[in-house]
Amino acid sequence: MISEVGPGASWKVGDRVCALLAGGGMAEEVVVDGRHVLPVPDGLSLAEAAALPEVYATVWLNLFQLAALKPGEKVLLHAGASGIGSAAIQLCKAFGNPCWVSVGSAERLAYCEALGAQGGVVRNGDLDSLNDLAPFDVILDPVGGSYAALNLKLLARDGRWVLIGLMGRREAQLDLAQVLAKRLHLLGSTLRNRDEQFKADLFSDLGQHVWPLFAEGRLSPQLARTFAIKDAEAAFAELATNKVSGKLVLVIDESLT
């Protein structure tokens, strides 16, 4: 909820909005560039809306801008039940891209399939069974090193491997012959340290291409649970269990949700 605006702002006090922040979001008030703000979609609570900007900006940037995903191309989403993964599944479904996932449990695989994933594998089982689902045109990967060699095998010719995290080691040994023979692209990507204009352009695209899909009922926030801000430590402890599907949100004022 906007409490103050600067000169020339297009927003007004009282507008229900959600925003992309570079940090500092666990606070009662934040200052944000008006170009990094979007309206809360009709029918959603503020808590639900808080779960949207970071994940949908990340997915749109990496799948649809950097990887230039085309309708019909196959996508593999590592950590498919995460906040980013759950947003990616929905966007893939909305834009005509069949997707598969790797996840941490059978329950999380079922969650992803209910959202629209075609299927996938549980990583504690046999990740190599992904070979039966390959080749993939695009892989969205927050894991990194431990999946690197597998990713090269799974990608189709001219495939794009978009690396957005390093949860599974920062170093890897790669067979560059596969990169050469299949003309593969490895794209490293970050969002938080991008400049203000880049984020403004990204949010303009989100407002045009993604936000209308909430009103159409084709996208929905995946809010696993809310915590009062005083219980932030408990929220981080739950996140650390690696059993959360979707997003956790800290709520400062219950009356505004």
Please state what every model-predicted region is.
Residues 103, 146-218, 251-257:
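Glycine-rich phosphate-binding loop and adjacent beta-alpha segment
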Residues 16-79:
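NAD(P)H dinucleotide-binding glycine-rich loop of Rossmann-like/cofactor-binding domains
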Residues 56-57, 82-86, 145:
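Glycine-rich NAD(P) Rossmann-fold beta1-alpha1 loop
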Residues 216-222, 233-257:
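C-terminal capping/lid region of NAD(P)-dependent oxidoreductase domains
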